[in-house]
């Protein structure tokens, strides 16, 4: 019993010593518990307008976090990381994504003038938006992308190109980049920029085929600060460059005789009109042709089903470019898209054609596309004259029932003959001679351009017909010359006469899987 009593006494003394040593902490904990209980008691009696939202709470916490971590920076670097640890861009950025700026205060000068200061935050538009870059020769590259339109109109941004070999023992090479603005003044928030990186003529870039990275140093032209973005635009891995491709004396035949570069396809497109267009042109250009289409939201599931048979045959390639909608450029950035197509397929085709999916290329009956192109071989570019067709006036020579069952280019047979100063043209180029291109022609090429090919080749334009998801015939006529809404038209059955041959070609090539295609 005495032993048990002594043990209890020792335990009580130990507890008292523990409480005495931590009395301050216990007081703080008890005070906090008392405050929480008080708040819990008073909250039901507070007015309903008093509230703290979750967003406000997050804001307060984030402000505390930013203030308490004044040196918490992160380096933002995307795109390929170089194997030889070359530093690309190292910009101190706060956790909330805002670049830290040195704070400046206004001053009163000795003469009494108040000197004001201006500090910029964030970006209204990106300095450069990269789409892709391509090798154009043994010492030249092309970089295609977007940049701020006001920046190029009102400032003087510059570009420098740097080749960084994968082998650290090789020297880096720098050269000035030449910018080409291709949009003819049509840009919006963004404009298309093609940067030509041509190194000295006696220099071969990556001569041992050991690999390397091309950097584009893009400046904003700021007169006060040297703001430069270093962007890795192209990485060549070892033994991937085919230098024979760029030797003129070893030039081999291209994979395609004719390659179609399409502009951005957007909107609610008619599957039937796309079906007619692709079947017509696959037949027209022949076996050694290819079609590159760019989906900016216009290739829906129904349209893709029309293209699918031709994709499976290797005649069509579709590029999904919907992400470019983030950057507000002219007509869904079509200038950037066609320039990317030009340089991507530059060494794969002898001729490239640029026109729209509501336009049909035509050569006279006694000619062929191959004979016409041979006659124009001395030119780097030729333009194609437009034949404007009505997209709502149909020829009713076979009666309404048969007319409505015909394809669009068969029944839309009335040509607009109103005299106008000029009409838009489309064009074709030999891509090896072109540095940058546009929508209606290229202004940046070497060699001659031919503008009088209307006797050799033309195109029929059914403006707006591609975006009509209904029967195109709004009015039926039988006459050879008519006037509709004070506009003169003549009957032109050129395309109508080819319809049966195109339908037969489609059936023989891909079968009857598209017979139930809807408007």
UniProtKB/Swiss-Prot annotation:
Membrane topology: Single-pass membrane protein
E.C. no: 2.4.1.-
Alphabetized GO MF terms: glycosyltransferase activity
Keywords: Cell wall biogenesis/degradation, Glycosyltransferase, Golgi apparatus, Membrane, Transferase, Transmembrane, Transmembrane helix
Main subcellular location of this protein, as a coarse class: Golgi
Parts of the chain that traverse the membrane: 28-48
Localization of this protein: Golgi apparatus membrane
Family membership: Belongs to the glycosyltransferase 92 family.
Protein name: Galactan beta-1,4-galactosyltransferase GALS2
């Amino acid at each position: 019993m005495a032993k048990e009593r002594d043990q209890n006494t020792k335990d009580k003394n130990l507890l008292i010593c523990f409480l005495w040593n931590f009395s301050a902490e216990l007081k703080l904990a008890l005070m906090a518990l008392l405050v929480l209980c008080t708040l819990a008691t008073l909250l039901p009696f507070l007015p309903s307008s008093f509230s703290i939202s979750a967003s406000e709470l997050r804001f307060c916490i984030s402000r505390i976090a930013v203030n308490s971590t004044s040196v918490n920076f992160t380096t933002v670097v995307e795109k390929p990381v170089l194997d030889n640890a070359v530093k690309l861009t190292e910009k101190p950025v706060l956790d909330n994504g805002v670049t830290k700026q040195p704070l400046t205060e206004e001053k009163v000068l000795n003469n009494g003038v108040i000197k004001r200061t201006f500090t910029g935050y964030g970006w209204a538009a990106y300095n450069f938006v990269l789409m892709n870059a391509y090798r154009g020769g043994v010492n030249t590259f092309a970089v295609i992308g977007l940049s701020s339109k006001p920046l190029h109109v009102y400032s003087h941004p510059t570009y420098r190109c740097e080749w960084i070999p994968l082998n650290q023992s090789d020297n880096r090479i720098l050269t000035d980049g030449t910018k080409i603005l291709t949009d003819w003044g049509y840009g919006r928030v963004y404009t298309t920029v093609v940067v030509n990186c041509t190194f000295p003529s006696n220099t071969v870039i990556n001569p041992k085929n050991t690999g390397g990275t091309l950097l584009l140093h893009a400046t904003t032209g700021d007169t006060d600060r040297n703001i430069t973005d270093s962007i890795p635009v192209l990485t060549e891995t070892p033994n991937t460059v085919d230098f024979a491709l760029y030797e003129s004396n070893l030039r081999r035949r291209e994979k395609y005789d004719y390659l179609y570069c399409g502009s951005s396809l957007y909107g609610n497109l008619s599957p039937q009109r796309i079906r007619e267009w692709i079947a017509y042109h696959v037949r027209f250009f022949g076996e050694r042709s290819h079609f590159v289409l760019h989906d900016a939201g216009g290739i829906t599931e129904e349209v893709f089903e029309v293209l699918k048979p031709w994709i499976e045959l290797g005649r069509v390639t579709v590029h999904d470019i919907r992400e470019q909608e983030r950057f507000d450029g002219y007509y869904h950035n079509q200038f950037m898209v066609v320039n990317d197509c030009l340089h991507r397929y530059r060494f794969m085709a002898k001729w490239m054609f640029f026109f729209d999916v509501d336009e049909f290329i035509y050569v006279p009956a006694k000619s062929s596309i191959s004979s016409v192109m041979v006659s124009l071989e001395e030119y780097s570019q030729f333009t194609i004259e437009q034949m404007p067709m009505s997209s709502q006036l149909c020829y009713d020579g076979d009666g309404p029932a048969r007319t409505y069952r015909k394809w669009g280019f068969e029944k839309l047979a009335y040509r607009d003959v109103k005299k106008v100063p000029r009409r838009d043209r489309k064009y074709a180029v030999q891509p090896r001679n072109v540095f940058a291109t546009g929508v209606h022609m290229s202004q940046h090429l070497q060699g001659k351009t031919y503008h009088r090919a209307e006797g050799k080749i033309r195109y029929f334009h059914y403006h707006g017909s591609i975006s009509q998801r209904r029967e195109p015939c709004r009015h039926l006529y039988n006459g050879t010359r008519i006037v509709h809404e004070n506009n003169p038209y003549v009957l032109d059955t050129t395309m109508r006469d080819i319809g049966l041959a195109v339908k037969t070609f489609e059936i023989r090539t891909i079968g009857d899987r598209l017979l139930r295609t809807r408007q």
